[in-house]
Amino acid sequence: MEAQNQEVAALVEKIAGLHAAISKLPSLSPSAEVDALFTDLVTACVPASPVDVAKLGPEAQAMREELIRLCSAAEGHLEAHYADMLAAFDNPLDHLARFPYYGNYVNLSKLEYDLLVRYVPGIAPTRVAFVGSGPLPFSSLVLAAHHLPDAVFDNYDRCGAANERARRLFRGADEGLGARMAFHTADVATLTGELGAYDVVFLAALVGMAAEEKAGVIAHLGAHMADGAALVVSARHGARGFLYPIVDLEDIRRGGFDVLAVYHPDDEVINSVIVARKADPRRGGGLAGARGAVPVVSPPCKCCKMEAAAGAFQKAEEFAAKRLSV
């Protein structure tokens, strides 16, 4: 325990130093200095760590919250920069690999799809919403192009400029793909009846920066999504919680969803993935109701441990060691 405490203290000290350096930057637009500092930050946060960011002291918690805002702003600048670069090509979709993290989105989208079809049996989405799509809507693009070829995607972002950049990427795109991707400037909190039309809603990590905001977004989705519809949430775990918000599974349950599976990566894919389903009274709840158990899929899916609801852990049968390719 003492060794773990020392490891956590050293990590927090390192990240605090990086936070101080990033805070002094004159701009968060892409540059050698910005890229180097954020690379150091990601490198520090990706390895497995015993840190529980929810238990940090007030000073460290304030630093973390500010760092998440800085990461969000820097990511926005980076994506806008590359969206403009890609838009200069006659067919931007032929050049997506120029974005340095495009491969991560390809892997993440495959992971999300694999988890969705595994834990929501029989799902065949025809209408999908992606909330928080941004200027580079790689996740919805890859899902639409490679995994859900029959689905129409409605991408929502509060920023009109981000949506305009996203639309430009589809100039010269194949008519089928381009026709299935729509972009809407809206805050998810203003969506009501629209949400009931979707088979699946994907919620990006940066929608709802603070814990109470995230809980509010999830509760709103739960109030308006159709019974039985799936919710796929991008989240963070462990030290990766210094980069993006953590999602509390209890907030998802309180929002009216059954949590079906949780995946925490141990590779360059930063995102954890949570698969949930809007509770359907006609079915008496889902696989993981308020008192059920949730599969925590441990990379590389050699086994699945069962996490009991309400914070308790119950032993469950082991799943076959079928590898979930990411």
Curated annotation (Swiss-Prot):
One of its GO terms (biological process) is nicotianamine biosynthetic process. Expressed in roots. It is an enzyme of class 2 (transferase). The keyword Membrane does not apply. One of its GO terms (molecular function) is nicotianamine synthase activity. SUPFAM superfamilies: S-adenosyl-L-methionine-dependent methyltransferases. It catalyses: 3 S-adenosyl-L-methionine = nicotianamine + 3 S-methyl-5'-thioadenosine + 3 H(+). Gene3D superfamilies: Vaccinia Virus protein VP39. Its EC number is 2.5.1.43. Keywords: S-adenosyl-L-methionine, Transferase. Induction: By iron deficiency in roots and chlorotic leaves. Belongs to the nicotianamine synthase (NAS)-like family. Synthesizes nicotianamine, a polyamine that is the first intermediate in the synthesis of the phytosiderophores of the mugineic acid type found in gramineae which serve as a sensor for the physiological iron status within the plant, and/or might be involved in the transport of iron. This is Nicotianamine synthase 2.
